[in-house]
Amino acid sequence: MATWITTPAELDAYFQQRPARIGLDTEFIRERTFWPQLALVQMAVGQDILLIDPLIPGMTEALAPWLADESIIKVMHSASEDLVAFKWACGVLPRPLFDTQIGASLAGIGGGMGYQKLVAEITGVALAKGETRSDWMRRPLSESQLQYAADDVEHLFALHDAIDAKLQALGRQQWLHDDGERLLASVANDEDRWPHLAMRSAQFLDAPAQRRLLRLLRWRDVQARSSDRPRSWILDNELAATLARTPPADAAALATLFEQFPKAPRKLAGAVWQALDTPLADEAEAPLALPANDTNKQALKRLQDAVAERSRELGLPDGVLASRKHLESYLERANGRPHWRAGAAGAGVAAAGAAAGTLKRRARRRIAIRLPSKAMKKGDPDHRAALCIPAVRWREDPPPWQRLTSSCSARHRRCAVRCRPQPYSSRSHP
């Protein structure tokens, strides 16, 4: 039977004898805000299940010291969004963290398993899913909501015991610790310096357009955080990409363009214009999303095959040792894997990476982009931009995987865009 906690004193009473671990989960709303609005905190302490009302004044402040206490293990499942909610509401992150979803993946039980499925796999208990989309800000909560909330933490200790035992037997407890620390660090430092790389449309934009897109997305993020509104309510991705690709000549042209987009931020038109037209101090350092070609697809396929073979040897589910995103990052920057994975991947993956780095695409003239990342379909209307991007030197002293030859493979015939080639020199770029 769960206990409803309505005062900080009631919460503190359960920590008079400091527990070795607590189970945690949250319910929150994030439909109309940038930050999640914490609506309920579920906590397992020993044999007790606590349902803590964070809407009561002083409750989040009372909760914060126990979340931050590093002598207490925090057992959670798929914790990333819950961590953001705790950070915003309580000002702290729960650590040390034992994420049962990550742990189940590393233990070879299954990758990306939901809580209900993992509970059924380990304990045999079938849990209901009926209140997933419930209104958790409403008071009082219904009996079915209370039962659903209690179920979310009731079995966390059983999962913790089973998964930790298997990780210990496999010698992978440090793996889980590393991934937990990485997750906590990503939530603590959640401002993405290069948000344009996460947009698929960026790979179809040339270098100046990508920099304009970066300006708009940086501005949008600041506005969303300060006004506590979803990013898409400030400026949606489609409009941002359109503005970056074909910037309006003046403010009047911007207003005309906004008429084509019902959700355009007309009241912020002046700020959008200023953001679009004002270079960032660090935009010259920005990595650019590179289009894919046959060479890159071959390189990615080699790495995927090598990773899949190594994953089978380790008994890991697909995508755990290295996801597609990790491999694309590895190809793009040769730095895509968390550090425990570097050793676990083994020589086979390293060899595949080395082989991928030597692949070259041969067309009418050679392109020597060694290791770009993003996928791109041939025949795309913006394919012409992709063909011309390699003709530009990206930075004065690029790393080996960014070395470029002097001209675009299209030779201006298929794209009708005049490149400004800069000769490649092996002496200036050893």
Task: Pin down the residues of each PLM region.
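Positively charged N-terminal leader segments that act as targeting/secretion signals
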Residues: 360-393, 397
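Accessory DNA-binding and partner-docking regions appended to nucleic-acid-acting proteins
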Residues: 143, 159, 163-360
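N-terminal accessory regions of nucleic-acid-interacting proteins
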Residues: 1-22, 26
